[in-house]
């Protein structure tokens, strides 16, 4: 008897795990990006003529949103959820969001965890090594505003005091779905403001 990949055998009867549903927009219940005017126009134009005419900035923006390279700056327990988003269940690389080890090859830095006063200069140094345009995702309550350690003498009350933050992902720790939603919001922000303005 062969088992389905989503089935697990326990004591004779198979149990079916829930399939991954993707990231749903809480307002509409539809997958994120299903109502994105940018992609709807491109799909309509491609299906109509087989090609489309666009400005160079639109083409660069489209390429940039599909090939964001991120660098981890995992400082505490949020880094576990950041690792989980790269695993097969969520597979963030299907959105063109691939990890890189060097800040010189990265477009996005994910600050995940408690930022201490001693670590703040290192964070700024790594941020300065990233090429322009560069983006920062602040992940978790500690990175957003100090979190549980807000009143500690050794904690920076938010990484936005050290580097400019583009997307805040709330939670303690935030789920992998929340981080994935933050990545999709960053892509939407890049499409909205373009790269020349940045």
Swiss-Prot record:
It catalyses: a quinone + NADH + 5 H(+)(in) = a quinol + NAD(+) + 4 H(+)(out). Its EC number is 7.1.1.-. [4Fe-4S] cluster binds at residues 77-78, 142, 172. Keywords: 4Fe-4S, Cell inner membrane, Cell membrane, Iron, Iron-sulfur, Membrane, Metal-binding, NAD, Quinone, Translocase, Transport, Ubiquinone. Residues 1-29 are annotated as: Disordered. Its main location: membrane. It is a peripheral membrane protein. Residues 1-20 have a biased composition (Polar residues). GO terms for biological process: aerobic respiration; electron transport coupled proton transport. It holds the Pfam family Oxidored_q6. Binds 1 [4Fe-4S] cluster. Its cofactor is [4Fe-4S] cluster. GO terms for cellular component: plasma membrane; respiratory chain complex I. The keyword Iron applies. It is found in: Cell inner membrane. The keyword Metal-binding applies. GO terms for molecular function: 4 iron, 4 sulfur cluster binding; iron ion binding; NADH dehydrogenase (ubiquinone) activity; NADH:ubiquinone reductase (non-electrogenic) activity; quinone binding. NDH-1 is composed of 14 different subunits. Subunits NuoB, C, D, E, F, and G constitute the peripheral sector of the complex. NDH-1 shuttles electrons from NADH, via FMN and iron-sulfur (Fe-S) centers, to quinones in the respiratory chain. The immediate electron acceptor for the enzyme in this species is believed to be ubiquinone. Couples the redox reaction to proton translocation (for every two electrons transferred, four hydrogen ions are translocated across the cytoplasmic membrane), and thus conserves the redox energy in a proton gradient. This is NADH-quinone oxidoreductase subunit B. The gene is nuoB.
């Amino acid at each position: 008897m062969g088992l389905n990949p989503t089935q697990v055998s326990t004591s004779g009867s198979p149990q079916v795990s829930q399939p991954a549903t993707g990231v749903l927009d809480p307002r509409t219940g539809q997958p994120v990006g299903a109502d994105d005017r940018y992609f709807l126009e491109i799909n309509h134009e491609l299906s109509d003529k087989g090609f489309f005419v666009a400005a160079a900035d639109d083409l660069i923006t489209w390429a940039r949103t599909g090939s964001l390279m991120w660098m981890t700056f995992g400082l505490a327990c949020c880094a576990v959820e950041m690792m989980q988003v790269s695993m097969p269940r969520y597979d963030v690389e299907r959105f063109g969001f691939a990890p890189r080890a060097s800040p010189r090859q990265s477009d996005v830095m994910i600050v995940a965890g408690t930022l201490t006063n001693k670590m703040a200069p290192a964070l700024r140094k790594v941020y300065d090594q990233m090429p322009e345009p560069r983006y920062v995702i602040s992940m978790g309550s500690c990175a957003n505003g100090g979190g549980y350690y807000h009143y500690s003498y050794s904690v920076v009350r938010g990484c936005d005091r050290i580097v400019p933050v583009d997307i805040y992902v709330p939670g303690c720790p935030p789920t992998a779905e929340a981080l994935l939603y933050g990545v999709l919001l960053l892509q939407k922000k890049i499409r909205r403001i373009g790269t020349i303005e940045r």
